[in-house]
Amino acid sequence: MTPTLETKYVFTITARIGDVTSAGEIGTGVRRIIPILGGEVKGEGISGQVLPFGADFQIIRPNELIELEAKYAFETDDGAVVYVENVGIRFGPVELLRKLKRGEPVDPKVIYFRTRPRFETGHPNYQWLMQYLFVGSAARHADRVVIDVHQVL
């Protein structure tokens, strides 16, 4: 018998995003690039600002399943810079996904949006971010993405 898989909420990343740039149909779907403009990180024992660079690189598959790969960084209030590489998928009813693409509001509970963030930092206070696996439950809004990050125990 293996250990029970459990998670614990640790913090929320709110990333402000810019306008979508499309590279068009690439044979496997439509490639989109969405700049990350800034934001905040808030949680128990960690808080800071999302730095104003990086992007979310997406492929929208023909069935509207969206594969995401975001690369960016945040700086904690005590000066640690943390690099983030976050991969995931977003899926739901086609019409609701199209509403999201148009910037229209959609109830996040009806869209499956999960991620696997990975963190890197040399700061001793945050080495634990590189010693565990994390998963995220996310919501897309017109001007931001909100990710609740959970540590896999």
Curated annotation (Swiss-Prot):
Family the entry assigns: Belongs to the UPF0311 family.
HAMAP family documented for this protein: UPF0311
A Pfam short name: DUF3237
Gene3D superfamilies referenced in this protein's UniProt entry, alphabetically: 2.40.160.20
Designated name of the protein: UPF0311 protein RPA1785
Organismal lineage: Bacteria, Pseudomonadati, Pseudomonadota, Alphaproteobacteria, Hyphomicrobiales
